[in-house]
C-alpha cells in the first residue's frame, strides 16, 4: 500500500490519531538497530492496515510489515488502595530496506 492509496482509503484525521507515542526503551532501541523497526504505542482499536497507513502518511517512508502486541495492564497496590495500569497496544513497524525513521529530532 502506498502513501497515496492510504490517504484515499482511510480518513486522514483518524490516521493522525492512530499513533499515540513512540516507545523509546532499551529493547525498542535494540530491535530498531537489529531489524530496521520502530516501536509505537497505538490506539486499542487500531488495525495493522491503519498503523501502516498512518506511518507512511506521517513519516513518508515505506513500511514492510507491522506486528501488533496487546499488553494487559498490571494491578498495583499502594497501601490499602488497589489500582490498575491501563492496557497497552504496541506496534512494531518494520521499514523497507534503505528506509530510515529518525524520532530523535536531530538532523544528519
UniProtKB/Swiss-Prot annotation:
GO-annotated biological processes: translation
GO MF annotations in UniProt: rRNA binding; structural constituent of ribosome
Record text on subunit structure and interactions: Part of the 50S ribosomal subunit. Contacts protein L29, and trigger factor when it is bound to the ribosome.
Xref: HAMAP family: Ribosomal_uL23_B
InterPro entries: Nucleotide-bd_a/b_plait_sf, Ribosomal_uL23-like, Ribosomal_uL23/eL15/eS24_sf
GO CC terms: ribonucleoprotein complex; ribosome
Keywords: Ribonucleoprotein, Ribosomal protein, RNA-binding, rRNA-binding
A Pfam family: Ribosomal_L23
Family statement drawn from the similarity comment of this UniProt entry: Belongs to the universal ribosomal protein uL23 family.
The protein's name: Large ribosomal subunit protein uL23
Protein role: One of the early assembly proteins it binds 23S rRNA. One of the proteins that surrounds the polypeptide exit tunnel on the outside of the ribosome. Forms the main docking site for trigger factor binding to the ribosome.
